[in-house]
Amino acid sequence: MKKMNPVVHFEMPAEDRTRMTKFYSSVFGWEAQQLGAEMGNYVIVKTTESGENGFPKNPGIINGGLFDKTPDNKVTSVVIAVDDIREAMKAVETAGGTILGGSFKAGEPDDIPGVGLYCAFLDTEGNRVSILQPNPKM
């Protein structure tokens, strides 16, 4: 049986990150952590208790993030964990998808400190999805 790669993160676009974090905090009790400009002002959203490595302690539950909504990037998407991001990028293209790359360099994955290598792509139906090669567990 072929290995299944799990969904490990979700991402939602926001026109106003402060307003959106207040909404999800008040309705669902989620916690938010604003990252700096060097990380594109991304907001980490915790939906469940996380360990020291930042990953959820409860199996099957995922955390997420908020990013600035743009005309080209205005839909909610998921992040799928992979063992080898470059191999997964090739598989996406072979299957008819389009590699968008990371936020910082088109066609190349971003190296997110403390997290791993990240890359976005469009599937055959035009859905924006991302892949993540997590850093090895210490």
Say what each PLM segment does.
Residues 44-47, 56-67, 104, 112-121:
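Glycine-rich, flexible loop segments associated with nucleotide phosphate handling
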Residues 38-42, 72-74, 111-115:
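Short acidic/glycine-enriched loop/turn segments that link adjacent beta-strands
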Residues 2-3, 7-15, 33-35, 65-138:
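Vicinal oxygen chelate
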Residues 20-22, 54-55, 76, 88-90, ...:
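Short acidic, gly/pro-rich beta-turn/loop elements at beta-sheet edges
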Residues 17-19, 50-52, 71, 85-87, ...:
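Generic "edge-of-domain/loop-turn" microfeature
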Residues 2-4, 11-60, 94:
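Core segments of cupin and vicinal oxygen chelate
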